[in-house]
């Protein structure tokens, strides 16, 4: 049976929950068109997150890997285009590490592009009435660290496997502690992630439409 690995993070930065894991854990053992979804939680820690991810990939042997993370302040589902080879942490991770301008992979390329049909995924999610867009940066914290490490592995050892990263907004129960911050319901995020998986599994070549940004 084909399997999809989807990951979420533990809470970080003083938050009580992390929306990525709150939604992703609901998808564990979900069957979608003959494909089984396997959910795993990653620690919000440089290095440790990639160790956990690589262990999960070895265990699950997926055809698709989707890593999900919290992007507090963003209003929509944002599918990441690129990961860069640098850790530059504005705040410490959950183990107290705060790397500055450190490469994720020594001698690795400057960046990797996603292995997902991101524009088709955005279009499909929008057609379901859920705000979504292509993001041009995954940041320089643990989310980018995981995306870069994932794509490095896939490019080196699992070239047939699709993979990438999706950022999601705060849940409403988090936004109450951040006045003015946008949020999205867990149900909407869940629907969006199910659509993202379905489209990623079906589409081999992305849509030739704009998903760029002016700044």
Curated annotation (Swiss-Prot):
Keywords: Cytoplasm, Hydrolase, Protease, Thiol protease
GO aspect biological process, one term: proteolysis
EC number: 3.4.19.3
Enzyme class, first EC level, given as a word: hydrolase
Pfam families linked: Peptidase_C15 (PF01470)
GO molecular function annotations of the record: pyroglutamyl-peptidase activity
Keyword Hydrolase attributed: yes
Active site: 80, 143, 167
Reactions the enzyme catalyzes: Release of an N-terminal pyroglutamyl group from a polypeptide, the second amino acid generally not being Pro
Annotated GO CC locations: cytosol
Protease as UniProt keyword: yes
Places the protein is found: Cytoplasm
Role played: Removes 5-oxoproline from various penultimate amino acid residues except L-proline.
Record's subunit section: Homotetramer.
Annotated family: Belongs to the peptidase C15 family.
Record-given protein name: Pyrrolidone-carboxylate peptidase
Organism: Yersinia pseudotuberculosis serotype O:3 (strain YPIII)
């Amino acid at each position: 049976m084909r399997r999809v690995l989807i990951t979420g993070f533990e809470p970080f930065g003083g938050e009580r929950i992390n929306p990525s894991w709150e939604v992703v854990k609901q998808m564990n053992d979900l069957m979608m068109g003959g494909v089984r979804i396997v959910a795993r939680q990653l620690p919000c820690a440089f290095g440790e997150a990639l160790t956990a991810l690589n262990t999960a990939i070895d265990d699950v042997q997926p055809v698709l890997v989707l890593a999900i993370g919290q992007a507090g302040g963003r209003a929509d589902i944002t599918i990441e285009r690129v990961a860069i080879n640098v850790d530059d942490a504005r705040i410490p991770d959950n183990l107290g590490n705060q790397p500055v301008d450190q490469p994720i992979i020594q001698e690795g390329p400057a960046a990797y592009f996603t292995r997902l049909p991101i524009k088709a995924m955005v279009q499909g999610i929008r057609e379901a009435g859920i705000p979504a867009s292509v993001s041009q940066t995954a940041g320089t914290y643990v989310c980018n660290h995981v995306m870069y490490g994932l794509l490095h592995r896939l490019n080196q050892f699992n070239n047939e496997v699709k993979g990438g990263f999706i950022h999601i907004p705060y849940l409403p129960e988090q936004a109450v502690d951040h006045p003015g911050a946008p949020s999205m319901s867990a149900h909407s995020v869940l629907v969006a992630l199910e659509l993202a998986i379905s489209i990623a599994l079906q589409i081999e070549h992305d849509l030739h439409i704009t998903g760029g940004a002016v700044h």
